[in-house]
């Protein structure tokens, strides 16, 4: 299997946007099926649509290729949005579940960095995107202390 194939073209951002929606819905339905309120679902989707729209616009004007490490970073972005909405919802502020999600996000951070070096798919966009997703997680964790 050739892992050096990238998703390119003007539809890469749009495909990533729909991937975000599907991934978020899968995450919500898999991780916390019994505790979820409608507020979490709507807040998560709203934030994700806003951030994904910006990402789609950036990908369209810069014509950046999406590779495997960037896709994993994108998964971390959606996971971080879900963590943020779980922290915002006071009723679902279950620290054990949130801690597991944060650890999963940190694990994926290591995986995407390793894969970008191993597959030789490091890009300037990937470096900046990874750093911004890391900063978003730091913001979320700082916000949770308030």
Describe each PLM feature range.
Residues 81-89, 136-146:
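Membrane-interfacial alpha-helical segments at the cytosolic side of multi-pass membrane proteins
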Residues 1-99, 108:
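Topogenic membrane-insertion module of multi-pass membrane proteins
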Residues 101-140:
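Acidic (Asp/Glu-rich) catalytic motifs at the cytosolic membrane interface
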Residues 88, 92, 118-122, 146:
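Transmembrane helix-loop junctions in multipass membrane proteins, especially transporters and channels
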